Every structure is written in C-alpha cells, then in structure tokens.
C-alpha cells in the first residue's frame, strides 16, 4: 500500500505476485533480510500454508485475497475435500470442482455432450429456480434432472450466471495470524 505522510510518500507494504515455493518466497526473504518491508500483500498464488511454514513469524499480519465464497456450500466442500485428503481452501479448487460439476449437469440437462448443448444448459442448471444442489450432491442433481426437475447448482462457490453467461466472482480476504492463513472477510 502506498500512502502519504505529511507531504512525503511512504510505502508500508510490498505487493508480492508470484508462487509460494518459487520466486515469491525469495522476494519476501530478500525484503525481510534487507529490512525493506515487514508486511506483504499476497496474490492468490502466494496463499498457502507452506509459505507460512517456510517464512515463519515474520509473515504475521501479511494479507491477500483469493477466489472463494464464505457460505454453507464452501464449508461443506471444505469438509468433503478434507475427508478425501485434499485442501479444499487452496486457490481455484472450489471453482474447478464447480466447473466440472456444472458441465456434467449441463450434459445431463441437454441429453448431449455437444458443446452447444452444454453452453445452452449451463445457466439452466446453475440458476434459480430449482432444487438446490450443494457439494457432494452431484448424483442427486443428475437424478433430479433425469426426472425432469429443475435444479439450482450452488456448489462450493455459490455459482450464479448473469444474462450474458458470466459468473459473478466471490473472493475471500485472508491474513496470516497465529501461524496460518485465516479468512477475515469477503470481497
């Protein structure tokens, strides 16, 4: 963040756009070693426990954002992922899960794996009205579509498409606190 103090510009935080175990880690270490910065704004590629484990307490108070919803669906997805040995909170994991589920549901709704049929059915299976489908309920959603019912797939990220076919994004703000990333809000 850049701010003005009196009439002088000061830079308090360093924005780090990189990857956890690659160049981004080196930028943080060099900044800490030189004393240039002590708080970091982290891109989604820098969010993960390994960076906190590698840097340690010096990363405390640093923050960033990444895609993700704060909802019952995202909590359920996190539980399902953990039960299957995965980190459901990692960047783009929920979005990838939802994309695959929506494609499967759109194929079922259209009765075809043709790309135009999938495109025509994405919003139909992802928007209200319909029976709400959450993470872990893909089979149920497929059964409801086969029975001719309308569904509203919400998934891990509360998917909703607008009239132009665009999905509204959800983002989480995270901060390093107590040796781990904690979600402090939604953007």
PLM segments and residue spans:
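Extracytosolic ligand-binding ectodomains
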Residues: 1, 7-8, 12-187
